[in-house]
Amino acid sequence: MKAGALELGEGSKTSIPRGGVNRGISILDFILRLITIIGTLGSAIAMGTTNETLPFFTQFTQFRAEYDDLPTFTFFVIANSIVSGYLVLSLPMSILHIVRSGARASRIVLIFFDTAMLALLTAAASAASAIVYLAHKGNAQANWFAICQQFKSFCERISGSLIGSFGGIILFILLVLLSAVALSRC
């Protein structure tokens, strides 16, 4: 008789209810959003405060490198700032999902905007990484020289700022997947 009961879909009484699993997913979603805020905001601040000045022959002639010398880095800072702002604004919805684990419409909205922010962050990080690669390696065919031999501090900071942004991309992928799993369980 027990086999017949299992065939009809009756499970054991120790199974976790769906609301509990969704609540756990919502708590993980909230924590991942906080970590992503730290990564993207840190990347924007690190890139936005990057500059280095080198003297050339005399103290009166100097070469400088700043993030806003290249529009790609400006786009990187703006995109990371927008994503950080969005994440801060999405925290109340994430808290709502912890309290009301069955909320479907707000999860759909979060999936939509999370995907849009993922695309923006990916575009900014990819464009900036191409410029960072050129700064490190140069391109002999285009007569672009590697500047990282002279501007070491500048290159270290712009390379480091990419880490938080690419970490944010990975976390956004996890956020979208978590929201989709939670939505499928509602």
From Swiss-Prot:
Q: What is its main location?
A: membrane
Give the GO biological process terms.
Answer: cell wall modification; cell-cell junction assembly
The answer on whether this UniProt entry bears the keyword Metal-binding reads no
Q: Which residues lie on this side of the membrane: Extracellular?
A: 48-74, 129-161
Report the membrane topology from the UniProt record.
Answer: Multi-pass membrane protein
Q: Where does the record place it?
A: Cell membrane
Q: Which UniProt keywords apply?
A: Cell membrane, Cell wall biogenesis/degradation, Glycoprotein, Membrane, Transmembrane, Transmembrane helix
Does this UniProt record's set of keywords contain Transcription regulation? no
Subunit organization:
Homodimer and heterodimers.
What the record says about family reads: Belongs to the Casparian strip membrane proteins (CASP) family.
Could you tell me what this protein is called?
Casparian strip membrane protein 3
Which species is the source of this protein?
Vitis vinifera (Grape)
